[in-house]
Amino acid sequence: MAASAQKLLGRLGTVGVGLSIAGGIAQTALYNVDGGQRAVIFDRFSGVKNEVVGEGTHFLIPWVQKPIIFDIRSTPRAVTTITGSKDLQNVNITLRILHRPSPDRLPNIYLNIGLDYAERVLPSITNEVLKAVVAQFDAHEMITQREVVSQRASVALRERAAQFGLLLDDIAITHLNFGREFTEAVEMKQVAQQEAEKARYLVEKAEQMKIAAVTTAEGDAQAAKLLAKAFASAGDGLVELRKIEAAEEIAERMAKNKNVTYLPGNQQTLLNLQS
């Protein structure tokens, strides 16, 4: 009885070990590909398989095959380049690039470039494209035609990146700086333009004041002509009228003054008082 029990326990132990080994093998034969990812299978005997594995749980041959996981979502990267413009000005330009690998070219990317494809490819091709594009514009055009520069760089960079299996979803110029000499020249030009605008304003103001003065003088001259014409038409009657008005005004002022004494036209009253 005891011997039978020992045999049974031995068999159960063997089965348990077998199940553990089988479970371990099954676990190593499964791998997951999450959302936004793709996988490439590396086989120890045949190398990189020319197929792309989508999302989900998948099987492989343990110890023979290995999954290489790629993130295929857009990733931002900034690349800065110092190059020369058409008029030989130093240009410091930075591009912000949203990039991702082309899913159907992942085996080729892994085989020829590796998982660090972005670090190996993007800085190199961005420098190459920017040097070629910036050399077509002078410094002033780089400022005034920034959208044109960005568009040309985007078209050329997308074509170049496609050769390596990279897709560029968005490209934008985030920084654009020039050498100190050009910057100082631009600042001096801006100051000169401001001074010119100020001088132009003062000249226009003086012209307006001159026109106003001429208009006023012409109005005064016209008024004087009209008065002279009126005096000539009225003759002595108008002069006598002005004298009467002036006398009335003087009399009114003197009447309000208490220290003023009126004397009649007959001087005999004053003579009688003196005698």
From Swiss-Prot:
SMART domains: PHB. Keywords: Coiled coil, Membrane, Mitochondrion, Mitochondrion inner membrane. PHB proteins are essential during embryonic development and are required for somatic and germline differentiation in the larval gonad. A deficiency in PHB proteins results in altered mitochondrial biogenesis in body wall muscle cells. SUPFAM superfamilies: Band 7/SPFH domain. It comes from Caenorhabditis elegans. It comes from the Eukaryota. CDD domains: SPFH_prohibitin. It is found in: Mitochondrion inner membrane. Belongs to the prohibitin family. InterPro entries: Band_7 (IPR001107), Band_7/SPFH_dom_sf (IPR036013), Prohibitin (IPR000163). Pfam families: Band_7. Its main location: mitochondrion. High molecular weight complex that consist of phb-1 and phb-2. One of its GO terms (biological process) is gonad development. GO terms for cellular component: mitochondrial inner membrane; mitochondrial membrane; mitochondrial prohibitin complex; mitochondrion. Residues 180-213 form a coiled coil. This is Mitochondrial prohibitin complex protein 1.
